[in-house]
Swiss-Prot record:
Role: Catalyzes the synthesis of mevalonate. The specific precursor of all isoprenoid compounds present in plants.
PANTHER family assigned: 3-HYDROXY-3-METHYLGLUTARYL-COENZYME A REDUCTASE
Catalytic activity: (R)-mevalonate + 2 NADP(+) + CoA = (3S)-3-hydroxy-3-methylglutaryl-CoA + 2 NADPH + 2 H(+)
Localization of this protein: Endoplasmic reticulum membrane
Name of this chain's protein: 3-hydroxy-3-methylglutaryl-coenzyme A reductase 2
Family the entry assigns: Belongs to the HMG-CoA reductase family.
Amino acid sequence: MDVRRRSEEAVYSSKVFAADEKPLKPHKQQQEEDNTLLIDASDALPLPLYFTNGLFFTMFFSVMYFLLSRWREKIRNSTPLHVVTLSELGAIVSLIASVIYLLGFFGIGFVQTFVARGNNDSWDEEDENDEQFILEEDSRRGPCAAATTLGCAVPTPPAKHIAPIVPQQPAVSIAEKPAPLVTPAASEEDEEIIKSVVQGKIPSYSLESKLGDCKRAASIRKEVLQRITGKSLEGLPLDGFNYESILGQCCEMTIGYVQIPVGIAGPLLLNGREYSVPMATTEGCLVASTNRGCKAIYASGGATSILLRDGMTRAPCVRFGTAKRAAELKFFVEDPINFETLANVFNQSSRFARLQRIQCAIAGKNLHMRFVCSTGDAMGMNMVSKGVQNVLDYLQNEYADMDVIGISANFCSDKKPAAVNWIEGRGKSVVCEAIITEEVVKKVLKTEVAALVELNMLKNLTGSALAGALGGFNAHASNIVSAVYIATGQDPAQNIESSHCITMMEAVNDGKDLHISVTMPSIEVGTVGGGTQLASQSACLNLLGVKGANREAPGSNARLLATIVAGSVLAGELSLMSAISAGQLVNSHMKYNRSTKDVTKASS
């Protein structure tokens, strides 16, 4: 069905007629008015329509069954077929009556519909042109925004004020009355769709599938939202984004996109290679501070980063009738003899998935199984979930009394601070270290080695312990992790466990130089899938040299990205701790992170 076709009510309301002039109606509607005087087949009995139909349907099949039975009996007894009893005669009459009714109700009406449609399928001249235009628009594959380039320019009605639908509010004075919401005029067909969505006739979520144009759907949805809420979305951009690229994988119900500035910190000298680290943030001074840390590391000979573990996790929960049965499955899963079988079942989910181990925990008659597997260059949540489902299906055959409560039961643990991630790790576990010379500490960081060591002990260790921190033994690791994650298309919500970090500082070389390290047990990153395929994020990954999958060594791009994240955190920790030690934190934030500019004017 063409959702953009204008309703009859809209057609009538779109024209202004003179006092003595009647609006033209489609002949189909006029025919319906004329047919009100005709007698239909359903008027055969003074009964409701469904009773009449049911009666004649029952009569038809009952009589047909009776006549067929009698016919078969006559053939079996060699009775002449033309010899008809009174009951058979009544059955024949009933059959003819039911056939006439059913043909009159269904067949003739169906034929009349096509005959009437062939003779009267026309509107008045203006409406026919409008309908033809809409049908031509439906066959066009290009978006409306590109109409001028495709040679199908659409006439646009003059711009006008569109009054938003807002709740009735008490009257206010002229001085307090807000300015009316002004939006660009939509085309006539878009206007009809907007009205249908506002009225609830068309679901907003179905616009992409009905229109076949993601950008146009976002534009219409944005206008609908403005009219319903009465709030302007003028500052939310719509153009300049490929909405087709996010359909079905990144975002639903789109109305635009937000703009986050991206800065560059570096070069970061890590494992003998230089990296320019993209950081998407709205916090002033963050990129500048991280950049200063990179400068200090570079001047001191660079940093070293080591990958300790690489394994994404998923932990389903199953329930048995007794705790004994749950323990039996625990012993079965943890038995090394059975691991190879379970691994083969798990690894069938993907050519990159490789099961590493299964860690079990019992809570009464419930068993939580934490699956750990490598996932190549993908972050791997979907991959490991598919593998877990395969294993659960296999175990269901062996343990018929096993009840699967959920494929994810928080023993993973995803997007939550958890001791299991802090201790066992999740994703990539990385440690990064550097030795900062005394000269660099004084000239670049403007502080002393002893002051940094003391501050780290009292702030990152003692202070965090007093606060009951879980994985938060650092200054601001999440700042750097979030900024790099947004820039490179990672899942920002996984910043929670990815920012687990303990920062250590120690004076070395007779107290002259500073040894600094960050240990991050659960960095969850990928270079394929999710937001990594978006143009901006893909460009940032390309800048780091980790775009896409590594065909020669699967998984190496994601592991390299994890080490870069850890190296960036090291730079950020070094610079912020130095600023606090030197008493520069407040001054720098007042200079770079506090502005008196009118941002609304700048954006307009």
